[in-house]
């Protein structure tokens, strides 16, 4: 149970960061390519066969889960599960506690992402409930318990000062997974099947050589996640730290297109990933549905960029949209303000001197962050819709 939770936890990080790791979406430029990309996927003449193959693999995994659960003592099972998540949480806590206090103003961003991740966890819960026993409800609950720390890792990995810490945390997580897999009495649920389904479809590895290949694949996935987050951070800072008024219109337009293209490429990779997980058994109707959703997100991004480039954004008097955003930030930060009262008192004099300029700067920064957060929410909706469609049998 504990190991299965750890692997599900890795799956969520993989899907989530791929979709949210980049701030904006341009599907105009890639749709000329995206449609041709879809053509590369093998056409399935009988979708029922494809979904039967997927269901069969899922049944096999869940059968292993059922058998292993029946062989374990309930108390031992709970203890092992608690120990695993305690160890993961301790790793995150050591690095993140100070940052959470210092970056209280960013908590509202984490909560928005948290709501989106809740949707993914609910989806996993629904799938498990269809085929597993009541004990499987513990899986999404445990993931939810560790969720806050996971999100803090993703957020803080955007900061250059945390690059080394992020790398260390990823190594620690890998060690935990490796230790769980090597344990004689509690091997991961369905062993390496879940990891393999995320990385490369094929037969279950039954010797050390194949196991080593899968371990290397997991490491590559984690390294790729880290690279995506770091690249996204650089791209966003390059755009948002530039004064639009001092920039030639053609240059700004090129930057806007770059934002679209970067995240657009992530979505194309996601489509390839869905194809890989199912071994090529995805009906093309799903791609059409993804494409429609991507068009909607593309329109949303265009509006957000237009709003970002609007001269009125930097005026002293914000419009209703930004007033509403400021109200939201104020509400979310109330608790953080209470925790930091002592520090605020010490800095009152300096804050008073800088109130006018700081308020305007923070407002502009929050407005930019809000556009990016909304984009991340829409992207995750695309993922959820796509995965739900993938798990819904299609009649031919």
From Swiss-Prot:
The keyword Amino-acid biosynthesis does not apply. Its main location: secreted. It is found in: Secreted. The keyword Signal applies. Residues 53-73, 109-129, 208-242, 287-308 form a coiled coil. Residues 231-256 have a biased composition (Acidic residues). Residues 1-21 form the signal peptide. Transmembrane segments: none annotated. Keywords: Coiled coil, Secreted, Signal. Component of the acid-insoluble and acid-soluble organic matrix of calcified layers of the shell (at protein level). Residues 231-260, 288-378 are annotated as: Disordered. GO terms for cellular component: extracellular region. This is Coiled-coil domain-containing protein 1. It comes from Lottia gigantea (Giant owl limpet).
